[in-house]
Amino acid sequence: MESESSQDDWSAFDPMSREYYDQVGNRYTNESGQKLIMEAPLPPKDEKEQRATRQAKYPYLVVPKSSPYVTEKMLINFFGRALIKEMEFRRLSRVYFVYFENIASLETAQQRVQRYPNLIKCITGRPQKEREITSDPVTSTEPMPTPGPAISATERTPVNHNREVPISTGGQNHPEFFRPPLVTKDDYKRGSLLATNDPIQRYLNVKYEFALERHDIYKLKDETRIPQVVLHFRSGRTIPLSTVAVTEEDKTKSLLEDGVSKCVVCQNWTDTFCKLCKMPFCNASCFADVAEQHKQACGKGEILNLDEKVGRKYPKPGLPPSGSKVRITAFEQTNVVYVRSADIQIDIAYYTVLTEVMMLGKDASKLQSTPVCGQIVLYKFEGHMSRAMVLNVDNIKEIYVVFIDFGSVEVTQLERLYECSSYLAGLTCYPVAVKLRGVPRRFVGPNIREVMYELDQSLVFNIKYSSREYDTSKGMQVVVMTEIDINRSLNRLFKTILTPVEPSVSDLGYKEDCLPYIPLHCGKNINVVVMDNTFIQCGFIYCTSIDLAYEVTKMQRDIQEYGEKIAKCATYAPPINELCIAKYEGKWRRGLSVELVGDGYPSILFIDYGNIVPTHVTDIRPYPPQFIFPIMTTQLDLIGVPEKPTDEQIKWLDKNYPIGSVITCSEITFDEETNSYSTRIEKLQEFLSLD
């Protein structure tokens, strides 16, 4: 018996068992102390029942842990914390069960999975066994109620008029203003100066697209990085400073020292001479004009006595052949540009013309009478004289001229115009207007302006065209231009800048502060245009100047194109104080969300006009970042209007200040404390004093 008990005692003896079964010694860690073996928590007893309840109550996705990067935090960041109701990880099957609040959240999550299929893979569905839950049988014999139709985001429900922000009434159309054409066919009647100086009727379709610079909204000295472009003055013109600075005597001396003389025919500088008599000629064309006279005088030391009609003083103007190199002199529209040949002979002749106009124009006298359409005059710009052709003199205070040596259109007054001699008027004009193929005509906004200003005359472009693409209605050749240095297509660049891109709904919107603002001019006897009067009973209207009213209408063409053909978002409800593109009376306009009431009709303030209208979400689109157009409409308070006007007073105000009318303000003032504009109108004061 004793031997058996001793054997039992020894069998229980195991000195290593304590260390083997001790959990403290069985923790495996790496160098940084991180556990390599995770301890699985004990599952609760009712885990299966709870899981079945969750799967029956909430829609879910099954995400397998296909890689170590698929973690709980990664799924939260991927789907969004707002969509996820709960999350469960099964260690044995190594899958995540992601539960969502509702079906809409599930569909949103599925769309994200479909958009990025390489990140995660999901298994949708619900096992039949786990979905079955024991419940008491329904003992009621009454039929189940028929579910109502699902609410559609595109359904137009009744408008909730219980709003904090007042809305406009009346449903009047927004006013449209179109600038009268600068030149008409009547100006080209037989015998007129315009018909003589513009035989191809190029200026019949000329446009003035740079009106915003007159209101100091675009300042070249601040906008551009190229110092020389300051002399472009809103359209690409360049005055060669080196040509102006160097005097004729110093330039002649330096050229003679380099073995350069003036051509006996065209009087341009050249280093080409006859080998026998050392007579200078520019090229074979100049030599051919005086070949007979040179043959008789060559080697005899005689000087050629040439008539003024002999030879061409300047190379022949016109559009160079396809494949030639050109330089840009000015931009008229987004798709119309003035170019000249970059040939060295044209360069010399072009700057010679500019220099001659500057030098001889110093002694010109001012115009004493109103010029006529088509007359060549001199215009003083930045202290230098330039040749210009008068296009429109309907308003003596706003005379439209085109700089024939550049191509740009300018508005000036009689005091800045000078008489042009017949000699200067007869000098050759080299810039030619061409139309960029595939580039639409759009509003000249900040983005395209900055590019225009930076395209200096130092840049050389390769021009290509086909004579079959000549636009006879506009009098221009359709061309493709490519910058030689970096092989960049000017047509493609302009088209990319001018085409707006619809932002994603998930992107942050744009505030009203992102847009520049052009305020009203303060002073006396100022004419303004009424853009909206729906809040006239509150004592204010929305106005702008006549010039800016043209720009507002011109801007709508781009916005309409975006709303009809580019924006594809079916529904959009912009947050409060964010910009959007909204439809009003069938036309797309710029808007600002001012109130959301949950009925599908956000209150939209149309910032270019001033009315506030509940607009359905199907008629709203996200605001594209390319539309950095300035706000040109201002709220104008009417001094003297009572806080609660009578019906008779409201009727009188609506009649005398209708939408689209031009009114004369006796005085416009600005209050810095309230940041508001107000006006005093004598006619209004007289009416209110009678009451």
Swiss-Prot record:
GO terms for biological process: meiotic cell cycle; oogenesis; primary piRNA processing; secondary piRNA processing. GO terms for cellular component: cytoplasm; cytosol; P granule; Yb body. Gene3D superfamilies: 2.30.30.140. Gonad-specific. SUPFAM superfamilies: Tudor/PWWP/MBT. The keyword Repeat applies. It is found in: Cytoplasm; Cytoplasm, Cytoplasmic ribonucleoprotein granule. Keywords: Cytoplasm, Meiosis, Repeat. Residues 366-427, 573-630 form the Tudor domain. Disruption phenotype: Both female and male vret mutants are sterile. Residues 128-155 are annotated as: Disordered. CDD domains: Tudor_vreteno-like_rpt1, Tudor_vreteno-like_rpt2. PROSITE patterns: TUDOR. InterPro entries: Tudor (IPR002999), Tudor_vreteno-like_rpt2 (IPR047396). It holds the Pfam family TUDOR. Changing residue 407 to E: In vret(39); egg chambers are defective with abnormal nurse cell numbers and improper oocyte positioning. Follicle cells often fail to encapsulate egg chambers, and occasionally form disorganized multicellular layers. Interacts with aub and piwi. Gonad-specific protein essential for germline development to repress transposable elements and preventing their mobilization, which is essential for the germline integrity. Acts via the piRNA metabolic process in both germline and somatic gonadal tissues by mediating the repression of transposable elements during meiosis. Required for primary piRNA biogenesis in both germline and somatic gonadal tissues. 'Vreteno' means 'woolspinning spindle' in Bulgarian, referring to its eggshell phenotype. This is Protein vreteno.
